[in-house]
């Protein structure tokens, strides 16, 4: 099962395998506090797409489309997440303040629709 959690929220045992899916390290968070098992930069949106989106909700629909297309080309990184999910929860950790418009949500939906 795939879950989402902000990096600023406390890790918990229910999180299972915790993966940071952002390209940039979150501000003000130590590696210890983040409690991550993996930082998977390769699954993050391209720098160009991230800059274009700029957390603008008006660009959300188009961002989802473009990012989903990018994820289809990142099979190696996506495979890591699929494999981890076979043995328990995988929590996709992200830094964005907007919980409804962020890259981790796109990754989660992609994994749920493209994992058997």
Language-model features and meaning:
Residues 1-116:
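Residues lining hydrophobic/aromatic ligand-binding pockets adjacent to catalytic sites
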């Amino acid at each position: 099962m795939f879950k989402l959690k902000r990096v600023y929220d406390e890790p918990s045992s229910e999180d299972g395998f915790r993966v940071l899916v952002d390209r940039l390290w979150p501000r003000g968070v130590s590696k210890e506090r983040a409690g991550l098992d993996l930082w998977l930069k390769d699954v993050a949106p391209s720098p160009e797409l991230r800059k274009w989106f700029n957390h603008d909700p008006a660009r959300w629909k188009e961002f989802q489309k473009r990012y989903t297309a990018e994820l289809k080309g990142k099979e190696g990184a996506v495979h890591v997440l699929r494999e981890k999910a076979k043995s328990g929860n995988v929590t996709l950790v992200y830094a964005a303040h907007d919980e409804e418009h962020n890259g981790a949500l796109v990754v989660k939906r992609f994994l749920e629709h493209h994992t058997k």
